[in-house]
Swiss-Prot record:
<dbReference type="InterPro" id="IPR050190">
    <property type="entry name" value="UPF0213_domain"/>
</dbReference>
<feature type="domain" description="GIY-YIG">
    <location>
        <begin position="4"/>
        <end position="79"/>
    </location>
</feature>
<dbReference type="InterPro" id="IPR000305">
    <property type="entry name" value="GIY-YIG_endonuc"/>
</dbReference>
<protein>
    <recommendedName>
        <fullName>UPF0213 protein BPUM_0019</fullName>
    </recommendedName>
</protein>
<dbReference type="InterPro" id="IPR035901">
    <property type="entry name" value="GIY-YIG_endonuc_sf"/>
</dbReference>
<dbReference type="Pfam" id="PF01541">
    <property type="entry name" value="GIY-YIG"/>
</dbReference>
<comment type="similarity">
    <text>Belongs to the UPF0213 family.</text>
</comment>
């Protein structure tokens, strides 16, 4: 079993576009993108901000989600992120009540 967390993440670029990727260290990867040493796509669209992320137990699961996300339209991506945020918020509120 892998011992690290694996993240699928979405960045919002300065031009409003989205960039999706995989990492096992969110903060380090965000700094890499903003330093201009990240993906070629984000170099010309800095600064970028962490817009959304999901944590997975395995690299494979995180990369599968990245692949799925990249096949969707922008509208579907925005809807997915909105729905997942609402779901996480509801889960958090439910946990606080327990």
């Amino acid at each position: 079993m892998e011992k690290h967390n694996h993240y699928f993440y979405v960045l919002k670029c300065a031009d409003g576009s989205l960039y999706a990727g995989y990492t096992n260290d969110l903060q380090k990867r965000l700094m890499t993108h903003n330093s201009g040493k990240g993906a070629k796509y984000t170099r010309a669209r800095r600064p970028v901000e962490l817009y959304y992320h999901e944590c997975f137990a395995t690299k494979r699961e995180a990369m599968q989600q990245e692949y799925r996300f990249k096949t969707w339209t922008r509208k579907k991506k925005d809807l997915y992120i909105e729905e997942m945020r609402i779901e996480k918020e509801a889960t958090h509120e439910h946990t606080k009540k327990l």
